[in-house]
């Protein structure tokens, strides 16, 4: 299995001969190294509806015929408003099996909407974190979130091999809360900081996060770099 980071919160997972992308913010992402014209995926998984996560989902889903997995509201919106054919709606606490592995959505403390060109936001369900089980490994993508103690319950139920955690502050946890979450609640084997440096408001030094974490290993990935098992 291979996990690649592509800026902001975009993660590319390759496992069981399938390709999965999380939060495909590609075209307007100054930190993304991917090209929307050449990306190949079988599944697209969404944590929530904000532009820097919802990103290129419509174009990518139509181009690749990938199945989009997200909240029930996002699935309905993509199907009815954008004509995306392959959608799989879920909600917090739900788990579903796919041919690459399983997806379970868990709690995240954030918000979730998509703003149309007319300036009106569309509610797209609850924000969520994702627990993947692929090839015997557990990956926890926290999504955009603040710190909450039930991260420890998530990790107790699903001991985490790799955790992708936001450190950008302002909209999500910053370095202090993110490192606390890793040290006290999640305790993964590998931590990967995400959701930072894409915009001025979330500029951070990931080395400070690495220095603050005292459990497992911290991998600071540049866009295009990966963790492989």
Curated annotation (Swiss-Prot):
CDD domains: metallo-hydrolase-like_MBL-fold. InterPro entries: Metallo-B-lactamas, RibonucZ/Hydroxyglut_hydro, UPF0173, UPF0173_UPF0282_UlaG_hydrolase. It comes from Staphylococcus aureus (strain MRSA252). The lineage of its organism: Bacteria, Bacillati, Bacillota, Bacilli, Bacillales. This is UPF0173 metal-dependent hydrolase SAR1785. Belongs to the UPF0173 family. One of its GO terms (molecular function) is hydrolase activity. It comes from the Bacteria. Gene3D superfamilies: Ribonuclease Z/Hydroxyacylglutathione hydrolase-like. Keywords: Hydrolase. SMART domains: Lactamase_B (SM00849).
